[in-house]
């Protein structure tokens, strides 16, 4: 099979003329794979500690006063009620999703704590928590737990595209991100 080139016969002849007397370079370089850094136990311990710290706020005995009329919603006292309206309209799109289907209450608390810690660590402002319909245990408990956490600014029943009444959109207070200082 003949190779097709876009060069004319004249250009090909000129190229061959310029390449006379050259020889092919022998490739004798060995490329070493970069050594992987050993994963230390400190980050794993830190993640577990963040998760435990975040789930520490969730109590089954404390019942925050939430509005039971209409969709599930909550806004912290120092946050504008306009944020709820923006959540209801779908102005926020969640970057992280948490599915609590099939989890026990204890597992759900741990996962909620891990989600909030991950949002703060990754500077994610909005997340979606899918509690499902099921036996309504997690559906009732999830808003009560979220309202107790100091880093939860607000939550509202999710729009249809994110799960409707089987999910919540949650606004998380993230630390102000500062770029690293240059030396």
From Swiss-Prot:
Keyword RNA-binding: yes
UniProt entry keywords in alphabetical sequence: Endonuclease, Hydrolase, Nuclease, RNA-binding, rRNA-binding
SUPFAM superfamilies: SMR domain-like (SSF160443)
Lineage: superkingdom: Bacteria
Pfam families: Smr
Top-level enzyme category: hydrolase
GO molecular function per UniProt: RNA endonuclease activity; rRNA binding
Enzyme Commission number(s): 3.1.-.-
Classification via InterPro entries: Smr_dom, Smr_dom_sf, SmrB-like
GO annotation terms (biological process): rescue of stalled ribosome
Gene that encodes the chain: smrB
UniProt family annotation: Belongs to the SmrB family.
Gene3D superfamilies: 3.30.1370.110
Function statement: Acts as a ribosome collision sensor. Detects stalled/collided disomes (pairs of ribosomes where the leading ribosome is stalled and a second ribosome has collided with it) and endonucleolytically cleaves mRNA at the 5' boundary of the stalled ribosome. Stalled/collided disomes form a new interface (primarily via the 30S subunits) that binds SmrB. Cleaved mRNA becomes available for tmRNA ligation, leading to ribosomal subunit dissociation and rescue of stalled ribosomes.
Subunit structure: Associates with collided ribosomes, but not with correctly translating polysomes.
Organism lineage string: Bacteria, Pseudomonadati, Pseudomonadota, Gammaproteobacteria, Enterobacterales
Name of the protein in question: Ribosome rescue factor SmrB
Sequence ranges assigned to domain Smr in this UniProt record: 98-173
Cross-referenced SMART domains: SMR
Keyword Nuclease: yes
